[in-house]
């Protein structure tokens, strides 16, 4: 099942032939991208620095790779270390995208964007959406933030950054290796090697899988689910409560199968409902003809809170990275802390 949202062309990842028109357009996109990047690198276009450290969490492919779970984990780590983080985002797909906005936990996703609302809901830190990330960063600094985390924005070169973190999906990687629109690449694969940290999103993985999936200089990120929170309020249930039961599983994310597999790994019988990424949900979208429990990702849940009921549950996702990753990152960041 799918609806209004964004769909990934199948030929990006499944090995099927790329339409000839897309092949012709890809070099044009690559050329414009390379020229734009060169303009910033050589100083032909101005870059703007903020008076506080800037960390960009992004990817070189179009679509989701696990940036938001990492951003949330990063914000929580920074706050625990005594920093006052703020998050800057474009707010993909939101209404009135030309108008900057402070995003709160209860901001409608149509106004604030899916990921910014989720980040505000999960962390409570200041979140600013603005097509101009320089302006967003300045607003966050004025609000008292002493470190800025950009959720996405690796290609937004106008904003100078101190640390770049690239996130790539372990299963999809860089797809067919072609530039948009023939493939998923926003920039050549070589761009990933220039980032300060490279994180591989493994989903559920053990240490052996992590070792096999990560090359030199790459850090494994595992995703964990443990509980389900009723959208109508009330106490969370452990996922073990649903073991042996059938549930409707809802995922409107870039890689919905991963969520379904995570639930199945917990012994839950899954009736899958894959929606488009950035799906604009309506109540009828969750009407499946039965009152089996409905388990959904938190990204979907923030768009369904207004009409959620007692059998609709959000499943929180927790990102886990090696302790050495956090040590390396905080060491780099501490060197940027003003004396």
Swiss-Prot record:
The EC number(s) attached to this protein equal: 2.7.1.130
Q: Name one GO molecular function term.
A: ATP binding
**Lineage, top ranks:** Bacteria, Pseudomonadati, Pseudomonadota, Gammaproteobacteria, Lysobacterales
Query: Which InterPro entries does the record match to this protein?
Result: LpxK, P-loop_NTPase
Q: Which UniProt keywords apply?
A: ATP-binding, Kinase, Lipid A biosynthesis, Lipid biosynthesis, Lipid metabolism, Nucleotide-binding, Transferase
Q: Which NCBIfam families match?
A: lpxK (TIGR00682)
Q: In which pathway does it act?
A: Glycolipid biosynthesis; lipid IV(A) biosynthesis; lipid IV(A) from (3R)-3-hydroxytetradecanoyl-[acyl-carrier-protein] and UDP-N-acetyl-alpha-D-glucosamine: step 6/6
Q: Does the keyword Secreted apply?
A: no
- Supply one GO BP term: lipopolysaccharide core region biosynthetic process
Name the family: Belongs to the LpxK family.
Residues annotated as binding ATP: 61-68
Which reaction equation describes what this protein catalyses?
a lipid A disaccharide + ATP = a lipid IVA + ADP + H(+)
A single Gene Ontology CC annotation of this entry is: plasma membrane
Please give the organism.
Stenotrophomonas maltophilia (strain K279a)
KW Lipid biosynthesis (keyword) present: yes
- The protein's gene is named lpxK
Summarize the protein's role: Transfers the gamma-phosphate of ATP to the 4'-position of a tetraacyldisaccharide 1-phosphate intermediate (termed DS-1-P) to form tetraacyldisaccharide 1,4'-bis-phosphate (lipid IVA).
Protein name per UniProt: Tetraacyldisaccharide 4'-kinase
**Looking at the Swiss-Prot or TrEMBL record, what is one Pfam family this protein matches?**
LpxK
């Amino acid at each position: 099942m799918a609806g209004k949202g964004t769909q990934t062309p199948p030929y990006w990842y499944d090995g099927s032939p790329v339409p000839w028109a897309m092949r012709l357009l890809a070099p044009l996109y690559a050329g414009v991208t390379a020229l734009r990047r060169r303009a910033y690198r050589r100083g032909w276009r101005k870059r703007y620095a903020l008076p506080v450290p800037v960390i960009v969490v992004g990817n070189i492919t179009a679509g989701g790779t696990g940036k938001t779970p990492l951003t949330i984990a990063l914000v929580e780590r920074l706050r625990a270390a005594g920093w006052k983080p703020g998050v800057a985002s474009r707010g993909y797909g939101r209404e009135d995208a030309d108008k900057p906005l402070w995003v709160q936990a209860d901001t409608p996703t149509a106004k604030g964007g899916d990921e910014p609302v989720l980040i505000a809901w999960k962390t409570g830190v200041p979140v600013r959406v603005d097509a101009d990330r320089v302006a967003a960063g300045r607003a966050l600094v004025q609000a008292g933030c002493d470190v800025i985390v950009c959720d996405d924005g690796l290609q937004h070169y106008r904003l100078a950054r101190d640390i770049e973190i690239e996130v790539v999906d372990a299963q999809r990687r860089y797809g067919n290796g072609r530039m948009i629109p023939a493939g998923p690449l926003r920039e050549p694969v070589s761009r990933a090697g220039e980032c300060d940290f490279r994180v591989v999103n493994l989903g559920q993985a053990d240490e052996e899988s992590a070792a096999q999936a990560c090359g030199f200089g790459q850090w494994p990120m595992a995703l964990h689910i443990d509980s389900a929170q009723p959208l109508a309020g009330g106490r969370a249930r452990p996922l073990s409560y649903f073991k042996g039961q059938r549930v409707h599983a809802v995922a409107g994310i870039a890689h919905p199968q991963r969520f379904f597999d995570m639930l199945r790994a917990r012994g839950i019988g899954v009736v899958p409902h894959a929606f488009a990424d950035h799906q604009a949900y309506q109540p009828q979208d969750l009407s499946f003809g039965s009152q089996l429990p409905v388990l959904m990702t938190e990204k979907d849940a923030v768009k369904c809170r207004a009409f959620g009921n007692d059998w609709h549950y959000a499943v929180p996702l927790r990102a886990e990275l090696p302790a050495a990753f956090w040590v390396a990152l905080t060491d780099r960041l501490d060197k940027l802390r003003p004396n």
